[in-house]
């Protein structure tokens, strides 16, 4: 009881009027949308809320609800007296809101009832305070008529209202998220919320446009137009950004060009690499090894890697004699001479493996016996190209071997150090190439004097060096 008494004390006149309106809605069997219109156009001294008018605007996209909203508004214009000017004023305000935010069908229907709206431009009412309250109604009616007659202004106002609606909702001007989409589930009607009829609509493009599929579709078409306009603006913004991106792209291209120009100047590196490879000893560089032959005696025998082409003729007879005496009896003086003088004699060392007493033929054989093919006798001016046969049994044609003579068999393996020297001297006198070799030996005899001293002083290091030279010759 106390709660009922407290509520009764807090009830005022406006609460009683609201309860009376609810009762009238039930008695008069008004629909929910008609009840909202009656609430938005009541006689209270305050205006209708924006949320309530937005719900009514959503209902205009439905065909059945649209036929409930607009007739109720027009009844406010005609059925109300001058004393209820607030309801007339609120009805004009709601109709203007629907023209800007509602369906495009509202514009067509309002233009059809434009005569009723023009009558309100002459509305007069002076209250008990001698105040002209009809001024607000006349002003609002005049503005609404001007809006309905200006199609360009309607397009601008609808576009502005759509942008404001997007700001309040927080979605923007995207047509996918609209308040009108919620009207499908909130205010169901017969069939689909999309109109199945075809009629002329008032498009945002200006004036009466082509036939659309319905109220909802025409609104979505206008929304799509607006979205396309926004897309164009975004495209312009992207175009500006694209120009900046193009500038950055040009700068990057310029940097790439500079890098390519710098990279074109780099082919000098392979030459440096080739110089490094030469330092490793893969190319012909015999000159650094020659000064070492004069300074140190053990290194004198190590300069025959590629220098044997020039130093083969510079070998003295005494050095070949000493080198031949260091080996055992199985190795003859001729074999030692070949190992010391010739760089390519190892490839044809088979004929030299047999001992021979008369070594005069070896003086005419150099580089594996290739030079003994065209031996010219010094005594006669004319000669016949026949192979010259010595006492040893060798034929000079490409180093072909023959049977040994009696002197070679009697000589055996024991050779003295004086026999090769005599053979060298005798062979050089009878052969033109031998004389050349002997003259070369006489010229470099002084340079090889140090080599003879080392060979005579120590025999074992010389043999090791000789083996090392033989291995190098095999590698060649």
From Swiss-Prot:
The modification Phosphotyrosine is found at residue 235. Residues 262-271, 444-454 have a biased composition (Basic and acidic residues). Residues 30-154 form the ENTH domain. The modification Phosphoserine is found at residues 173, 228, 243-244, 459. It holds the Pfam family ENTH. GO terms for molecular function: clathrin binding; membrane bending activity; phospholipid binding. One of its GO terms (cellular component) is clathrin vesicle coat. One of its GO terms (biological process) is retrograde transport, endosome to Golgi. Gene3D superfamilies: 1.25.40.90. Residues 229-240 have a biased composition (Acidic residues). Residues 178-198, 213-222 have a biased composition (Low complexity). Keywords: Phosphoprotein. SUPFAM superfamilies: ENTH/VHS domain. Residues 157-198, 213-308, 410-429, 444-472 are annotated as: Disordered. This is ENTH domain-containing protein C794.11c. It comes from Schizosaccharomyces pombe (strain 972 / ATCC 24843).
């Amino acid at each position: 009881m106390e709660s009922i008494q407290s509520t009764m004390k807090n009830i005022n006149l406006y609460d009683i009027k609201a309860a009376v309106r609810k009762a009238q809605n039930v008695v008069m069997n008004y629909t929910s949308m008609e009840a909202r219109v009656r609430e938005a156009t009541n006689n209270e001294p305050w205006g209708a809320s924006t949320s309530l008018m937005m719900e009514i605007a959503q209902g205009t996209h439905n065909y059945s609800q649209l036929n409930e909203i607009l007739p109720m508004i027009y009844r406010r214009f005609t059925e109300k007296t001058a004393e209820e000017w607030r309801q007339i004023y609120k009805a004009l305000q709601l109709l203007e809101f629907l023209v800007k935010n509602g369906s495009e069908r509202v514009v067509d229907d309002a233009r059809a009832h434009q005569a009723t709206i023009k009558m309100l431009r002459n509305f007069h009412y002076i209250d008990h305070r001698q105040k002209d309250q009809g001024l607000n109604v006349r002003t609002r009616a005049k503005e609404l008529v001007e809006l309905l007659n200006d199609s360009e202004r309607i397009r601008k106002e609808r576009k502005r209202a759509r942008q404001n609606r997007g700001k309040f909702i927080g979605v923007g001007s995207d047509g996918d998220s609209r308040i009108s989409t919620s009207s499908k589930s909130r205010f169901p009607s017969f069939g689909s919320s999309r109109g199945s009829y075809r009629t002329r609509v008032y498009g945002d493009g200006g004036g009466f446009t082509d036939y659309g599929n319905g109220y909802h579709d025409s609104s979505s078409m206008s929304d799509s137009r607006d979205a396309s306009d926004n897309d164009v603006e975004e495209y312009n913004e992207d175009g500006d950004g694209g120009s900046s991106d193009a500038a950055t792209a040009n700068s990057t291209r310029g940097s790439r060009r500079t890098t390519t120009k710098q990279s074109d100047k780099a082919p000098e590196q392979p030459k440096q690499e080739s110089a490094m490879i030469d330092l490793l000893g893969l190319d012909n560089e015999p000159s650094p090894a020659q000064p070492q032959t004069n300074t140190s005696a053990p290194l004198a025998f190590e300069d025959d890697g590629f220098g044997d082409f020039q130093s083969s003729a510079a070998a003295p007879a005494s050095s070949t004699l000493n080198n031949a005496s260091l080996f055992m009896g199985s190795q003859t003086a001729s074999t030692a001479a070949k190992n010391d003088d010739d760089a390519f004699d190892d490839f044809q060392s088979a004929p030299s493996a047999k001992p021979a007493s008369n070594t005069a033929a070896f003086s005419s054989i150099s580089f594996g016996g290739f030079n003994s093919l065209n031996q010219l006798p010094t005594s006669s001016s004319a000669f016949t190209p026949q192979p010259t046969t010595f006492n040893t049994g060798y034929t000079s044609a490409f180093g072909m071997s023959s049977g040994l003579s009696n002197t070679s068999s009697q000589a055996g393996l024991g050779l003295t150090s004086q026999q090769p020297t005599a053979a060298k001297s005798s062979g050089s006198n009878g052969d033109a190439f031998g004389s050349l070799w002997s003259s070369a030996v006489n010229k470099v005899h002084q340079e090889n004097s140090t080599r003879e001293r080392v060979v005579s002083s120590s025999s074992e290091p010389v043999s090791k060096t000789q083996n090392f030279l033989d291995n190098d010759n095999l590698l060649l």
